[in-house]
Amino acid sequence: MQIFVKTLTGKTITLEVESSDTIDNVKSKIQDKEGIPPDQQRLIFAGKQLEDGRTLSDYNIQKESTLHLVLRLRGGMQIFVKTLTGKTITLEVESSDTIDNVKSKIQDKEGIPPDQQRLIFAGKQLEDGRTLSDYNIQKESTLHLVLRLRGGMQIFVKTLTGKTITLEVESSDTIDNVKSKIQDKEGIPPDQQRLIFAGKQLEDGRTLSDYNIQKESTLHLVLRLRGGMQIFVKTLTGKTITLEVESSDTIDNVKSKIQDKEGIPPDQQRLIFAGKQLEDGRTLSDYNIQKESTLHLVLRLRGGMQIFVKTLTGKTITLEVESSDTIDNVKSKIQDKEGIPPDQQRLIFAGKQLEDGRTLSDYNIQKESTLHLVLRLRGGN
């Protein structure tokens, strides 16, 4: 069948393909016609960047479909990785490399399996699926490599009565695991335990190594008295959820309860009270949230952000987007909200008309940026 590939210069290339062709094959055909190396090609269809190993039929690309070709400038760069022994490793990477890719490169150089590597930049532990550009890691940035050692150690837990409990743990144990070990020894249910280290309340899903808890560290155990209260959580759709909580509950705990009720992952939740966004490690009592208080829940799309779109009538529309969304995606979201077909929309930012195949990040459109929407009258340009 025939498909079309449109470049940013406006040129359209026609390719003969089969639905079983992979995206790699298509990139090779483009190289044959245009001389552009596959590793500099990004192909976009229906607002999605296409992955090399997938086939055209995987993406439901049919005859006479149009793909958009965006060039990936050779964006090789060097970064440094510093180990705890003080050794510095130099890596050749691209901003689009994922943290997994970087760990594989470290394995190639140093022989350390990726699952024993933790990479830190600007004080943050880097997540495998994210890219270097997601973390704004630029050329000659230095990452820190911490090894996740296999193997156990002892830690101490001190109660308010002054009693000290000794536990056998591993750095990869989660706080939940530690609470279960305390329950085994002392019979205290995990939901009545609050663990404190270095002045911080420890969150259940995190590991000991996340908090830099090492052998012979001492944690403090505070009991959470039963004696709950009800609070309300109001969503943007106007729905109100009732939760049973305690003043000593952390914001993380509250988000977990919302997940149990509504199925919304905590990392997509933003909670607002008295105009303030609530921070995960803090407790309800830190914010003076009392019984029958109402919190507001705003959804955070993955890696998402809000942008505004202003129409000529002066109306402003708020959209939840991601930097990797293409202009097509944004037009579809506007259609969902306002009913305006994408082909009648022209979007302007910083005086430039935005092109469909490009992404928000291509135009450096960041959270709370304002785009302008101009309607394209039928029959005109």
UniProtKB/Swiss-Prot annotation:
Q: Its domain of life? A: Eukaryota
Which GO BP terms, alphabetically? modification-dependent protein catabolic process; protein ubiquitination
Q: Coiled-coil region(s) at which residues?
A: none
- Disulfide linkage: none
Cross-link Glycyl lysine isopeptide (Gly-Lys) (interchain with K-? in acceptor proteins) residue location(s) = 76
> What InterPro entries does the database record attribute to this sequence?
Ubiquitin-like_dom (IPR000626), Ubiquitin-like_domsf (IPR029071), Ubiquitin_CS (IPR019954), Ubiquitin_dom (IPR019956), Ubiquitin_ubiquitin-like (IPR050158)
Here the cross-link named Glycyl lysine isopeptide (Lys-Gly) (interchain with G-Cter in ubiquitin) sits at 6, 11, 27, 29, 33, 48, 63
Which consequence is recorded for altering residue 48 to R? Deficiency in ubiquitin-protein conjugate formation
Q: Where in the cell is it found?
A: Cytoplasm; Nucleus
Record domain Ubiquitin-like: where:
1-76, 77-152, 153-228, 229-304, 305-380
Which residues are trimmed away as propeptide when the chain matures? 381
What PROSITE patterns does this protein map onto?
A: UBIQUITIN_1 (PS00299), UBIQUITIN_2 (PS50053)
The record, for SMART domains, names:
UBQ (SM00213)
Gene Ontology cellular component terms for the protein in this record: cytoplasm; cytosol; nucleus; peroxisome
Provide this UniProt record's keywords sorted from A to Z: Cytoplasm, Isopeptide bond, Nucleus, Repeat, Ubl conjugation
Q: Which chain regions cross the lipid bilayer? A: none
State a single Gene Ontology molecular function: ubiquitin protein ligase binding
Q: Name one Pfam family in it.
A: ubiquitin
Misc. comment: Ubiquitin is encoded by several different genes. UBI1 and UBI2 genes code for a single copy of ubiquitin fused to the ribosomal proteins eL40A and eL40B, respectively. UBI3 is a polyprotein with one copy of ubiquitin fused to ribosomal protein eS31. UBI4 is a polyprotein containing 5 exact head to tail repeats of ubiquitin. For the sake of clarity sequence features are annotated only for the first chain, and are not repeated for each of the following chains.
Q: What does this protein do?
A: Ubiquitin exists either covalently attached to another protein, or free (unanchored). When covalently bound, it is conjugated to target proteins via an isopeptide bond either as a monomer (monoubiquitin), a polymer linked via different Lys residues of the ubiquitin (polyubiquitin chains) or a linear polymer linked via the initiator Met of the ubiquitin (linear polyubiquitin chains).
Family listed: Belongs to the ubiquitin family.
Protein name from the UniProt record:
Polyubiquitin
Q: Which organism is it from?
A: Saccharomyces cerevisiae (strain ATCC 204508 / S288c) (Baker's yeast)
Gene name of this polypeptide: UBI4
